[in-house]
C-alpha cells in the first residue's frame, strides 16, 4: 500500500435431523464449484424422496447423517456458502471424519474448520461429490426408508447418488491449472466505511469456522488505523458485518494460521520495526493479539517508503517473507520453519527488478492447489489505473516467470475485471479455504478480495475512498 504522507500511526427425532444434513450438503457442494450465489434449504434424495437429516437433531460434533421424511426442521436446513461449505445450525459443516477417502465412510457434522474434508461439489447430473475424496454422497445400500445411513461411495450413477434441490455445475476432476488469460466477474462495492473513516483497504482474508474473516487498513484522511469485520458467511453479508477497530494499528496486514505451533499470526508494517508480528488463539478478537514482536529489521535503498507490503508463506522446510518497496523491486527473506514465529533479521535477497510502475507494491504469494507451482501477484501502476501482474515459480526459493504480466493481459485489472464501479484493482488477497501458512488457493475456484474506488475520485492518496469488492474467475 502506498502510504503517502500519513503518520504511522426442538423436534428431535433422529431421522428428521439427518434429512436436514443432506440438504445442507447439496448447497455446500454448489458453493465449491466455480463461485455461485449462496442458498439455503433441504437436499432431497432422488431415489428416496427423503431429506438429508442430522440424526436426533443433535448439534454435537460427530453427529451422523441419515435419510428422513422432509419436514422442514432446523436439522434439515442447510446453507451453501460461497466458501464451499454446507452448513447447518449456522456453525456446523458437513464433514468427512478424519479426512477419510474410503468408500463406506459415513458423513457427519463438525465445527467448520476450513479443511478440504468439508468441501463439496454439486454436479449438474445430481451427484454430490466430496472434493477431497472424489466420492459421491449416497444413501447406503440404495436404501429408501427413514433412518438409512448417508455415506461416501464410488460414483456409479445410481439413483441413490442423485439429489435434487440445488442447481448443479458441470463435473470436474477437482483440479485445475491456472489460466494463461484471466477473465473475472466482479461484485459491486461490498461495504462502506463506518463514520470517521474515509477508506477500507489493504485486505487480508481467511476462512475461519466456515465464515469469511477479513482484516484491513483504515484511513481517516490524516492517519491510518486497522480493523476487522465481524465474521460473515457470504460476501453479500459484508455490508452489514460489524467493523471493529483495533486499539493498536496493524497496517497492511497478513493473517494466517501457523499450524506447526497451533497459533494465529498477524503480520503488518509501521511500528518499532519495518515489519512486525503478533499472535493469538482467537483471530476474531481484534484486541486479543499479543505484544508486537520484530518480524524484519532490515532497510532497503532507493525507496521512499522503505520495506512495504509484506506477505508470508511456507513450504515444508522454510518460512519465506516477500515484500516490496514502491521502487520496482521485490525482496525475499527466509528462515527455517521451526524458528517461526520469529525475526527474519535484516538480510534479504532482491529477486525481481523492473520499473517502479511495473513492480510497485501489494505483493502476494500463494501455493497453487494440485500443482507443483507457486503464484505471485504484484500491484502495478498503469495508464488505466492500478492492476495486478502475475508470475509463477516451481519453488519459493527459485526464480519467477511472468505469466499474465501486462496491462492489456493482466492477472486482474480494468482490462479483464468485469467491474463497472472501479477502474483500479488494488491491494487485496486471494480467498483461501485453508487458512494455514501454505497460503494454498484453488485455481478451480479463484476469488480475489480487492480494493477499488470510483473512477472520478481524486485528491491526496490518503483521502481516496477505497472500498472492498470481490472478483470471481470465469471459466
Swiss-Prot record:
The keyword Flavoprotein is annotated on this UniProt entry: no
InterPro entries recorded: GH62_arabinosidase, Glyco_hydro_beta-prop_sf, Ricin_B-like_lectins, Ricin_B_lectin
Secretion signal span: 1-37
An annotated GO cellular component: extracellular region
Catalytic class of the enzyme: hydrolase
Pfam families linked to this entry: Glyco_hydro_62, Ricin_B_lectin
Lineage, top ranks: Bacteria, Bacillati, Actinomycetota, Actinomycetes, Kitasatosporales
Protein name as annotated: Extracellular exo-alpha-L-arabinofuranosidase
Amino acid at each position: 500500500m502506498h502510504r503517502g504522507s500519513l503518520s504511522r500511526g426442538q423436534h428431535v427425532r433422529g431421522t428428521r435431523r439427518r434429512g436436514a444434513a443432506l440438504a445442507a450438503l447439496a448447497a455446500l457442494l454448489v458453493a465449491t464449484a466455480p463461485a455461485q450465489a449462496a442458498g439455503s434449504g433441504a437436499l432431497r434424495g432422488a431415489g428416496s424422496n427423503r431429506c438429508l437429516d442430522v440424526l436426533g437433531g443433535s448439534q454435537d460434533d460427530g453427529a451422523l447423517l441419515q435419510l428422513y421424511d422432509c419436514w422442514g426442521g432446523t436439522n434439515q436446513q442447510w446453507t451453501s456458502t460461497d466458501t464451499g461449505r454446507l452448513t447447518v445450525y449456522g456453525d456446523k459443516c458437513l464433514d468427512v471424519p478424519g479426512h477419510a477417502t474410503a468408500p463406506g465412510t459415513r458423513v457427519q457434522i463438525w465445527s467448520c474448520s476450513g479443511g478440504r474434508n468439508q468441501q463439496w461439489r454439486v454436479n449438474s447430473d445430481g451427484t454430490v461429490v466430496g472434493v477431497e475424496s472424489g466420492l459421491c454422497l449416497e444413501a447406503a445400500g440404495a436404501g429408501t426408508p427413514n433412518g438409512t445411513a448417508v455415506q461416501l461411495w464410488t460414483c456409479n450413477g445410481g439413483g441413490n447418488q442423485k439429489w435434487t434441490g440445488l442447481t448443479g455445475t458441470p463435473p470436474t476432476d477437482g483440479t485445475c491449472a491456472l489460466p494463461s488469460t484471466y477473465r473475472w466477474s466482479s461484485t459491486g462495492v461490498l461495504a462502506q466505511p463506518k463514520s470517521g473513516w474515509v477508506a477500507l483497504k489493504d485486505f487480508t482474508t481467511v476462512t475461519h469456522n466456515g465464515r469469511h474473516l477479513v482484516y484491513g487498513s483504515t484511513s481517516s484522511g490524516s492517519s491510518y488505523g486497522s480493523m476487522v469485520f465481524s465474521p460473515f458467511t457470504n460476501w453479500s453479508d459484508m455490508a452489514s458485518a460489524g467493523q471493529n477497530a483495533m486499539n493498536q494499528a496493524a497496517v497492511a496486514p497478513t493473517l494466517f494460521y501457523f499450524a506447526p505451533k497451533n497459533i494465529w499470526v498477524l503480520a503488518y508494517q509501521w511500528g518499532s520495526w519495518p515489519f512486525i508480528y503478533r499472535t493469538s488463539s482467537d483471530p476474531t478478537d481484534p484486541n486479543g493479539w499479543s505484544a508486537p514482536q520484530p518480524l524484519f529489521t532490515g532497510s532497503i535503498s532507493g525507496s521512499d517508503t522503505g520495506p512495504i507490503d509484506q506477505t508470508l508463506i511456507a513450504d515444508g522446510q522454510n518460512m519465506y517473507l516477500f515484500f516490496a518497496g514502491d521502487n520496482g523491486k521485490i525482496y525475499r527473506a527466509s528462515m527455517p520453519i521451526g524458528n517461526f514465529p520469529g525475526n527474519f533479521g535484516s538480510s534479504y535477497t532482491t529477486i525481481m527488478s523492473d520499473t517502479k510502475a511495473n513492480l510497485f507494491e501489494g505483493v502476494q504469494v500463494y501455493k497453487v492447489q494440485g500443482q507443483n507451482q507457486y503464484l505471485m501477484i504484484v500491484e502495478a501502476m498503469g495508464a488505466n489505473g492500478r492492476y495486478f501482474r502475475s508470475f509463477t515459480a516451481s519453488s519459493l526459493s527459485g526464480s519467477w516467470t511472468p505469466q499474465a504480466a501486462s496491462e492489456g493481459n493482466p492477472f486482474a485489472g480494468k482490462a479483464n475485471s468485469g467491474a463497472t464501479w472501479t477502474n483500479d484493482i488494488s491491494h487485496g488477497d486471494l480467498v483461501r479455504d485453508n487458512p494455514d501458512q501454505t497460503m494454498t488457493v484453488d485455481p478451480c475456484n479463484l476469488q480475489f478480495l480487492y480494493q477499488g474506488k470510483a473512477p472520478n475520485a481524486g485528491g491526496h492518496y490518503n483521502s481516496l475512498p477505497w472500498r472492498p469488492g470481490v472478483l470471481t474467475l470465469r471459466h
